[in-house]
Amino acid sequence: MVEADHPGKLFIGGLNRETNEKMLKAVFGKHGPISEVLLIKDRTSKSRGFAFITFENPADAKNAAKDMNGTSLHGKAIKVEQAKKPSFQSGGRRRPPASSRNRSPSGSLRSARGSSGGTRGWLPSHEGHLDDGGYTPDLKMSYSRGLIPVKRGPSSRSGGPPPKKSAPSAVARSNSWMGSQGPMSQRRENYGVPPRRATISSWRNDRMSTRHDGYATNDGNHPSCQETRDYAPPSRGYAYRDNGHSNRDEHSSRGYRNHRSSRETRDYAPPSRGHAYRDYGHSRRDESYSRGYRNHRSSRETREYAPPSRGHGYRDYGHSRRHESYSRGYRNHPSSRETRDYAPPHRDYAYRDYGHSSWDEHSSRGYSYHDGYGEALGRDHSEHLSGSSYRDALQRYGTSHGAPPARGPRMSYGGSTCHAYSNTRDRYGRSWESYSSCGDFHYCDREHVCRKDQRNPPSLGRVLPDPREAYGSSSYVASIVDGGESRSEKGDSSRY
């Protein structure tokens, strides 16, 4: 039975609470055969005061409406009129009224009768008030009053339509909750874990790495005074050893720095007492600022290592390109102590370099950034052991100021094929010493008279040109000391 095709449905309102389906059928059955009597009940199965009666013949329904409208039934005046569908509904399926969006009238009808008939969705044809006190035949009002307590469960079981707006509202609430929680969860994911503070140790490890250039691409300006000073002066009795490439001043090879301060690139301060600094290999300490492009750096910016103390040897086993830093510096207005890489060593301070020691090799090998540790050691010692062009059986002896040291004997040992002990003075009258050897054992006593192994007899009578002279060194003095006599020779001062 299609509801749209069944116009014989009457709405009976204002019923007594005690009136039941049998009474209604007995009263209205006088006008014609009745196919369905539907008494609307609440949750407690009590009558809500209105019902729907469907006649088999629509003409009988019209006659019953005329006869029974306004009559009294069980002590109450009833209203009988043609039930019709709400104006907002269309088609065969009934939509729930707006006021009862969470409940289905069909479910309520089924709860009243136990079966759904053709009376679903029918509304009275006109509005009016009856004697039940506040009841209106407008089914928008009646449904809103009568169906709100009804559960949603019977609606879904009775085959009625699902709730129209309850689920979307729940979804909207869940979505709003998710929306409110989502950004919070995202904020928790993004900002929940505090960023780990870059500690000094981890920063130093990054700076010490040979594969990473540290802060090579950092364009920060105005760093602090001791920005790149990774290691403080070592404590007494502590020997620091480094297995890197030791390109100490390579940080300013592409620095493009202007107006540098007084002690900017002084990597090694005057050594402190009782320590030995050792560098084994290929560590590029200051390559971190190789592409820094930093201006106006502070006074002790790139002073990384406080050198060893008085009376102890500084040793470098590697490819130490000490002065590669000023190859591509493009620096303007350096201050008074800018290019002073090494402070004047104290007396009895022996600087030793067991390696390639190409001090001014910056013009030829300025771009060799990724030489491995094994490569540096293997290449350096292989070149010296095979008699390369840098130092061929070269042995020079000298002191810091042309005089033997006054303190106790300082024995220094090393092993290589060539020896060079030189005294270099910068333009400020300060000196630094380098002792480079490659192959066989030697030892130096307090007067710096060194004895070599007999595998490579020293040639004391001549002084071979040093690679620093070929590239331009900083006015060094190479002295050969035999007993107390010395002979000096000056190179050009084209470097500074």
Swiss-Prot record:
Tissues showing expression: Testis-specific.
InterPro entries, per the entry: Nucleotide-bd_a/b_plait_sf, RBD_domain_sf, RBM, RBM1CTR, RRM_dom
Annotated segments matching region Disordered: 81-345, 452-496
Compositional bias ranges of the Polar residues kind: 175-184
Keyword Amino-acid biosynthesis: no
One CC-aspect GO term: spliceosomal complex
Keyword field contains Nucleus: yes
Known partners and oligomeric status: Interacts with splicing factor proteins SFRS3/SRP20, TRA2B/SFRS10, KHDRBS1/SAM68 and KHDRBS3.
Protein name, UniProt field: RNA-binding motif protein, Y chromosome, family 1 member F/J
Species of origin: Homo sapiens
